[in-house]
Swiss-Prot record:
One of its GO terms (cellular component) is host cell plasma membrane. A motif (PTAP/PSAP motif) lies at residues 88-91. Coiled coil: none annotated. Plays a crucial role in virion assembly and budding. Expressed late in the virus life cycle, it acts as an inhibitor of viral transcription and RNA synthesis by interacting with the viral polymerase L. Presumably recruits the NP encapsidated genome to cellular membranes at budding sites via direct interaction with NP. Plays critical roles in the final steps of viral release by interacting with host TSG101, a member of the vacuolar protein-sorting pathway and using other cellular host proteins involved in vesicle formation pathway. A lipid is attached at residue 2 (N-myristoyl glycine). This is RING finger protein Z. GO terms for biological process: viral budding from plasma membrane; viral budding via host ESCRT complex. It is a lipid-anchor. Interacts with protein NP; this interaction probably directs the encapsidated genome to budding sites. Interacts (via RING domain) with polymerase L; this interaction inhibits viral transcription and replication, Z partially blocks the product exit tunnel for the releasing nascent RNA product. Interacts with the glycoprotein complex; this interaction plays a role in virion budding. Interacts with host eIF4E; this interaction results in eIF4E reduced affinity for its substrate, the 5'-m7 G cap structure. Myristoylation is required for the role of RING finger protein Z in assembly and budding. GO terms for molecular function: RNA binding; zinc ion binding. The gene is Z. It is found in: Virion; Host cytoplasm, Host perinuclear region; Host cell membrane.
């Protein structure tokens, strides 16, 4: 399977590559597919929950906990307590 253009683009530009188009490679940054995505549904979110050596979103964690106490991906016990490691972004209240 190669890259295919629509008939309109081929008629206008021929079979040559269009200038300014950047080819997609498999060397994507880890942020697009890596550890900060839910390994069950690949949802990207800052509110992911650590499970073993990967992360799960709250929806997938809830679904897995309704079926079993162990992770379906890494077979380790699922987290039952959420620990927030980031400090609040708002400044402290000073009256």
């Amino acid at each position: 399977m190669g890259l295919r253009y629509s008939k309109e683009v081929r008629d206008r530009h021929g079979d040559k590559d269009i200038e300014g188009r950047v080819p997609m490679t498999l060397n994507l940054p880890q942020g697009l597919y890596g550890r900060f995505n839910c390994k069950s549904c690949w949802f990207v979110n800052k509110g992911l929950i650590a499970c073993g050596d990967h992360y799960l979103c709250l929806g997938c964690l809830t679904r897995m906990l309704s079926r079993t106490d162990f992770c379906e991906i890494c077979s380790k016990p699922l987290p039952k307590k959420i620990i927030f490691e980031d400090s609040p972004s708002a400044p402290p209240y000073e009256p």
